[in-house]
Design a protein with these regions (language model features):
Chain A
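Glycine-rich, N-terminal phosphate-binding loop of Rossmann-like dinucleotide-binding domains
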Residues: 65-67, 91, 141
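Interdomain hinge/lid region at the active-site interface
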Residues: 200-273
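NAD(P)-dependent dehydrogenase/reductase Rossmann-like domain
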Residues: 245, 252-254, 258-323
Length: 323, 323
């Protein structure tokens, strides 16, 4: 099993370090915070240059787990000290990471990653080896992704307990704009509209407002880094929301009828619940035949996951929705 | 203690019947569903005409607890059989109820009500005597509301375990548009935008999307009745949301910066949390001096509640926010 060098040991990076170690891999990390606590937990912490030199020497996979604004700086170091390493990341937005890799570490063998797991607490102290158990973990399969790099990164994600969702950088960013970044923007809009109603409105707020504004309590800096980093895709999602809300406004003003809006929303939520309640079918993809990356992307597009490998076969599960 | 006649014995009406009985009041009801179950639970169920005749004879307070589209029909019956009764309702939107009262039962002594309690299950089977414990319960105090009617309805709400929020019909409808109806519209828009992302997006949806779309799983007919019944106030709230979302769109497209949007939303949610964590100061309102209805409305405008009466004094609590 390939060794793992994790750069950035907050909630996600720390959990990758712990999970990969629990899977039996040799691990070490670099961090700008909590180094003593990581060491006290029994893990090797090196400064970034040394961590990357060791990655080159031991042919480790390097996992970038720093916030997006710090990614390019880490990539420069990788270009200097481990320029041909196997590389992935666990940063939310994928487009800017791909651009940074092309610019600063173009000779690495890269497949981007995004584990869909988290919790409200942050930092090393909140990290845990089981954070990814059962979670979806995107590993990007673009036209120019090397199949062996993709597979090795997918194996790391599976070792950490996750199921792997193969998709492109662009499709990932478009999807998370809709289901992760747009929810933050709409929660902020709703919270501001409610607060504009003054103490009377807040005193009457019940579950619908509480749920709809929950993520507005997240630290603004984190939300901004996430949303602004996915600017182009989020703009499309916001335009979609503006169009739908504008249609609701028009219907309310003209006929007073919100049926199309409310029923489309109900259908959307029912689709989510149906997806989550779906049965699972098994499928296998031969990684030696045809266009395996395209086959893998089709699994992701259908809401499926890669859950393991058997020789040259990738083992997949696909949701089976009731008719 | 005045007897209570509840018309409509679903979740809310059934819970009023149970709570008022538990407070020691004589109660009976009328219902189009579950009459056998209500009787089996030990309560008197009459047909609507007889229930209202008994209300007239025993000088009971009549509580309208039917869905908004059925309110006018009940009001006609009240005009026929108990035209001068003390009257309230527990329907969400207040404007259309006030209009119906003026048209069909203008001689009743009316103060509108809206208990801010509920749960996802509906119907008599879901009702419980403790549903309103600690909840806010709006009792409308308009310019033409009779103080003694307001007080008696408030006493019923307090007997049911709630704290009473005094405000006007118009201010109530504006507030619930922001904190109850707009959340449903935005949840519907978000759910539709997410589902438009297909199975890939649904497979990546985590907490922010799940929370933000939770109320989109409500029965569309109930949501439509609620939202469409509050058309004018909801239109204002939707316009506010459209303006804020449009501003976010413009900022994202021009500078890419969402700071104003995200920080205003964070401040709004912080205001909600601060309100809920606030300490409580006591206040008293002399119902025999000055303009007591205006004093009561000021309590509601400050996020306060009436929690009891002592002779001619109304006892209030007001939130005390940390500086």
């Amino acid at each position: 099993m390939r060794a793992v060098c994790v750069v950035g040991l907050g909630l996600i990076g720390g959990s990758v370090l712990r999970a990969a170690a629990a899977a039996g891999r040799t691990v070490w990390g670099a961090t700008t915070a909590d180094a003593d606590a990581v060491t006290a937990a029994g893990f090797d912490v090196l400064d970034l240059d040394k961590a990357l030199k060791r990655a080159r020497k031991e042919d480790a996979v390097v996992v970038i787990a720093v916030p997006l604004p710090s990614v390019d700086g880490v990539l420069r170091k990788i270009g200097d000290f481990a320029p041909r390493c196997l590389l992935t990341d666990v940063v939310s937005v994928k487009g800017p990471v791909v651009e940074g890799v092309a610019r600063f570490a173009p000779e690495t063998r890269f497949a981007g990653g995004h584990p869909m797991a988290g919790k409200s607490a942050s930092g090393w102290a909140a990290s845990e080896a089981t954070l990814f158990t059962g979670a979806a973990w995107v590993v990007t399969a673009d036209e120019d992704t090397a199949l062996d790099a993709w597979r090795e990164v997918a194996e790391l994600a599976i070792d950490c307990g996750a199921g792997v969702v193969p998709t492109t950088t662009q499709e990932h960013d478009a999807a998370v704009a809709r289901i992760s970044h747009l929810p933050h923007v709409l929660a902020a809009v709703l919270a501001a509209c409610g607060a504009d109603g003054g103490p009377l409105a807040l005193s009457l707020a019940a579950g619908s407002f509480t749920d709809g504004t929950r993520v507005a309590s997240s630290r603004p800096e984190l939300v901004l880094a996430m949303c602004e980093g996915n600017r182009a895709a989020l703009l499309e999602a916001v335009d979609d929301a503006l169009g739908k809300l504008g249609a609701a406004r028009g219907a309310l003003a003209s006929t007073g009828a919100l049926s199309a809006t409310i029923r489309a929303g109900h259908a959307g939520r029912v689709a989510l619940d149906a997806y989550r309640a779906a049965g699972q079918a098994q499928a296998m993809i031969d990684l030696t035949a045809g266009d395996p990356l395209e086959e893998l992307r089709l699994i992701g597009a259908q809401g499926g996951r890669i859950v393991g490998f058997d020789g040259d076969l990738a083992l997949a599960t696909l949701p089976v929705l009731p008719d």
